[in-house]
A protein has these predicted regions:
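Phosphate-coordination loops involved in phosphoryl transfer and adenosine-cofactor binding
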Residues: 27, 109-112, 184, 193
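An N-terminal-biased, well-structured beta-alpha scaffold segment characteristic
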Residues: 1-57, 163, 183
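N-terminal Rossmann-fold NAD(P) dinucleotide-binding loop
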Residues: 122-123
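Glycine-rich Rossmann-fold phosphate-binding loop(s) that bind the pyrophosphate
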Residues: 118-119
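Gly/Ala-rich phosphate-binding loop of Rossmann-like dinucleotide-binding domains
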Residues: 126, 130, 214
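Rossmann-like adenosine-cofactor binding region
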Residues: 17-21, 137, 141-216
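Phosphate-binding beta-alpha-beta segment of Rossmann-like dinucleotide-binding domains, i.e.
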Residues: 56-112, 127
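N-terminal glycine-/charge-rich "phosphate-binding" loop or analogous flexible N-terminal tail
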Residues: 1-6, 133-135, 146
């Protein structure tokens, strides 16, 4: 009741609801030490005159881009499987050969990587991909076209991205628009061999649709 400010890195287990803010009459600000504010009732905060802030620092979005790169390399190179096989003494097993997608000619040059969302994280991820000489496409209706041009990325619609990408990487915040944006229809458009990387919020992807696709 006496709080003037609330802060936290991840408060999804105890979201800041309108009722919580109403119980703190002196509350002036809810400050997130991370990028997402999906665990704060922003609409209620606006009505109550409470400022909501986030921290879009490089240490946040750059680390996510690096984590995305790490996941892709781990999957393509079968890092976990190789580690486990080495410990079992089966390091010569032919099934441990790397996974190569697209027309393999020079490294991963034949790969098409599609990014849904082209904000700071995705653009940093694009920088990390530069030495790979892969084809990069992206979908983001809110980013000006010049951003894509400056990053040497081809801007496409969502359907095209899903159909053409060998790797689909999600880089969006969780909003009403993006919640469950990857569902049965979207997964059905993807290649059978495609890899889906989600370093956004889990609720961006329809979990049941994803499980069904993997099992069938």
């Amino acid at each position: 009741e006496e709080a003037d400010a609330l802060t936290g890195t991840s408060i999804r287990s105890s979201p800041i609801s309108g009722n919580i803010m109403a119980a703190a009459p002196n509350l002036r600000i809810v400050a997130k030490a991370s990028i997402g504010v999906d665990d704060v009732d922003v609409e209620a905060a606006t009505k109550q005159g409470v400022l909501v802030t986030n921290s879009p620092l490089e240490s946040n979005w750059s680390a996510v881009a690096e984590g995305t790169m790490s996941m892709i390399l781990s999957l393509l190179k079968k890092t976990r499987e190789r580690d486990e096989a080495m410990k079992r003494g089966e390091w010569r097993d032919p099934v441990l050969q790397g996974t190569f997608l697209g027309n393999r000619q020079d490294g991963y040059k034949g790969l098409t990587i599609g990014m849904i969302g082209f904000g700071r994280t995705a653009r940093r991820f694009t920088d990390l991909l530069a030495p790979w000489r892969v084809r990069i496409i992206a979908y983001d209706p809110y980013i000006e076209p010049s951003r894509f041009v400056l990053s040497n990325v081809t801007r496409v619609d969502l359907t095209t991205l899903l159909k053409e990408s060998d790797i689909v990487s999600l880089h969006v915040t969780l909003t009403k628009e993006t919640r469950q944006m990857i569902g049965v229809e979207e997964i059905g458009l993807m290649k059978q061999t495609a890899i889906l990387i989600n370093t956004s919020r889990g609720q961006v992807v329809n979990e049941k649709a994803l499980i069904d696709a993997l099992q069938n």
